[in-house]
């Protein structure tokens, strides 16, 4: 009798995705982040639904309802802290996952990559509307500043802003709709994640060497299912440690003050995971230019597959591109630091240089480095012996 997991219509789908999935034998811990993101999404959905049972989306009671959750609901303080800090871990995993994709050339699976960029935008949107819900000072002013950016859209800008606000300022209607969006979007993210996996399983996973691994595949279970469990344990340990010992470490003190439209906080800034994009937005003096740069900072990822010039897929054997990649990582960290700083000298000029370098790396330096490495490879091959020349025809990976 055939195994039920291989014949049952529903179990067969799960089996092909999680049990008998052929995976390259050499994928490293950097390939853990996909499953960690699935764990993050699941944890955020569960904690979020429990919070929604006690939260009230009304400007008169929203702030009090969050305080009520932390004080009066059984383990409400834990659920709230796990949800707030879970968002930070979600973004840590996303940025590491994207970084892995850039380093190892996973972006050459164009459909999977582009759906991943859409997922990143959806998660950023969800986190933004979620940050507004506690209705503290930074929630209110963050919502005001970011939604106001839409007024830069020519001709329809002001109408668009008032349409999103549901009035002439950020008010009750805004909070109600943001709660509706924050509840709905994670389910859309879950659906798009299924698409992301569907396209990934059409091609199979990439690997650190960037080579076709069809000749050397092993089943996902038990090898990588157990390997992923170690990642789960490490992440959950880190998340619970943060949520239990320093739950407000990554938050903003201004958000412990109820929203007041008459008092502007001295420095309006988003959560730490948006600071790099916020720094790019602020580095351009023109409002419309800033909004376009903000969008471009994420959408530039969609251009990466088309700007791949190297004959090799991953950066494993490409030292020049490796240097540029780590320069990009350092640059994003500098932008994150600048995003949290006031708009004054020398932070303005540092932010502008870092923003210019950010786009230069993606649009100019990476393609040039790939082209240069091809030339160096050809030069090396032309001076090699006939036997060595046989291995001088690299493929961009399978």
Swiss-Prot record:
Signal peptide annotation: none
Binding site for a ubiquinone: 201
Protein task: Component of the ubiquinol-cytochrome c reductase complex (complex III or cytochrome b-c1 complex) that is part of the mitochondrial respiratory chain. The b-c1 complex mediates electron transfer from ubiquinol to cytochrome c. Contributes to the generation of a proton gradient across the mitochondrial membrane that is then used for ATP synthesis.
UniProt keyword annotations, A-Z: Electron transport, Heme, Iron, Membrane, Metal-binding, Mitochondrion, Mitochondrion inner membrane, Respiratory chain, Transmembrane, Transmembrane helix, Transport, Ubiquinone
MF terms in GO: metal ion binding; ubiquinol-cytochrome-c reductase activity
Iron-sulfur recorded as keyword: no
Annotated positions binding heme b b566: 97, 196
Residues that, per the record, bind heme b b562: 83, 182
Organism name: Hypseleotris compressa (Empire gudgeon)
Name of this chain's protein: Cytochrome b
Transmembrane segments: 33-53, 77-98, 113-133, 178-198, 226-246, 288-308, 320-340, 347-367
Main subcellular location of this protein, as a coarse class: mitochondrion
Name of the gene this protein is made from: mt-cyb
Cofactor binding mode and count: Binds 2 heme b groups non-covalently.
Membership in a protein family: Belongs to the cytochrome b family.
């Amino acid at each position: 009798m055939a195994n039920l997991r291989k014949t049952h219509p529903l179990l067969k789908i799960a089996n092909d995705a999680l049990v008998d999935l052929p995976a390259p034998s050499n994928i490293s811990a950097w390939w853990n982040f996909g499953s960690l993101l699935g764990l993050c999404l699941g944890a955020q959905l569960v904690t979020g639904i429990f919070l929604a049972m006690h939260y009230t989306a009304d400007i008169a009671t929203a702030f009090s309802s969050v305080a009520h959750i932390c004080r009066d609901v059984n383990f409400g303080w834990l659920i709230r802290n796990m949800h707030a800090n879970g968002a930070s871990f979600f973004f840590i995993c996303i940025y590491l996952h994207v970084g892995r994709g850039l380093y190892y050339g996973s972006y050459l699976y164009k459909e999977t990559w582009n759906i991943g960029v859409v997922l990143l935008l959806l998660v950023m949107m969800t986190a933004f509307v979620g940050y507004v819900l506690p209705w503290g000072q930074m929630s209110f002013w963050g919502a005001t500043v970011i939604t106001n950016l839409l007024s830069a859209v020519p001709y329809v800008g002001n109408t668009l802003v008032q349409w999103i606000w549901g009035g002439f300022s950020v008010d009750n209607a805004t909070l109600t709709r943001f709660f509706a969006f924050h509840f709905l979007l994670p389910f859309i993210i879950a659906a798009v994640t299924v698409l992301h996996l569907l396209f990934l399983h059409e091609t199979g996973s990439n690997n650190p060497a960037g080579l076709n691994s069809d000749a050397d595949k092993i089943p996902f279970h038990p090898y990588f299912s157990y390997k992923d469990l170690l990642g789960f344990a490490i992440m959950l340990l880190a998340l619970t440690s943060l949520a239990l010992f320093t739950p407000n470490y990554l938050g903003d003190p201004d958000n412990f003050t109820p929203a007041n439209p008459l008092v502007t906080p001295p420095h309006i800034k988003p959560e730490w995971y948006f600071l790099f994009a916020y720094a790019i937005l602020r580095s351009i003096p023109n409002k419309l230019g800033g909004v376009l740069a903000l969008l471009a900072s994420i959408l530039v990822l969609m251009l990466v597959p088309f700007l791949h010039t190297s004959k090799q897929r991953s950066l494993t054997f490409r030292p020049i591109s490796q240097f540029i990649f780590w320069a990009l990582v350092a640059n994003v960290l500098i932008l994150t630091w600048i995003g949290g700083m006031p708009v004054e000298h020398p932070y303005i000029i540092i932010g502008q240089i870092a923003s210019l370098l950010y786009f230069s790396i993606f649009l100019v330096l990476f393609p040039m480095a790939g082209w240069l490495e091809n030339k160096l490879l050809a030069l090396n091959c032309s001076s090699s012996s006939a036997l060595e020349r046989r291995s001088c025809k690299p493929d961009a990976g399978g």
